[in-house]
Curated annotation (Swiss-Prot):
Site, as annotated: Increases the nucleophilicity of the active site Cys: 114
GO cellular component, one term: chloroplast
Name of the featured protein: Ferredoxin-thioredoxin reductase catalytic chain, chloroplastic
Protein species of origin: Glycine max
Domain of life where this protein originates: Eukaryota
Gene: FTRC
Reaction(s) catalysed by this chain's protein: [thioredoxin]-disulfide + 2 reduced [2Fe-2S]-[ferredoxin] + 2 H(+) = [thioredoxin]-dithiol + 2 oxidized [2Fe-2S]-[ferredoxin]
Keywords, ordered alphabetically: 4Fe-4S, Chloroplast, Disulfide bond, Iron, Iron-sulfur, Metal-binding, Oxidoreductase, Plastid, Redox-active center, Transit peptide
Amino acid sequence: MTTQASTFAVAVPSVATPFRRHRNPFVVRAQAEPSDKSVEIMRKFSEQYARKSGTYFCVDKGVTSVVIKGLADHKDTLGAPLCPCRHYDDKAAEVAQGFWNCPCVPMRERKECHCMLFLTPDNDFAGNEQTITLDEIKESTANM
């Protein structure tokens, strides 16, 4: 026997039903990955911008990989590479405003990248590379 919870519109087991372990029904998991084309576009953009700005990727290429995939996902879903490291109440409005589209205004004006994608040489987390391969991105993010 189940009752309908009107607030959330989900079935709730009655008290008589024994407790069963199931995944949390309120957890939403993303199913889609960004397209390989968008990941490649954002990879190339990131390499070019690092060279142009005199910045470097994080010594942990996993950080670089996750950010590039986040940018690619936003490029696919929003049409622009909105910074994936921030919370937005309205992503579409943020894309239209352009402030947080990569490279964001703080990066362009002061070389401050919140995502740690573009790091100045004096940053403790900066590596010495301005390149990353598509295979490195796939390998770093395979189990995520």
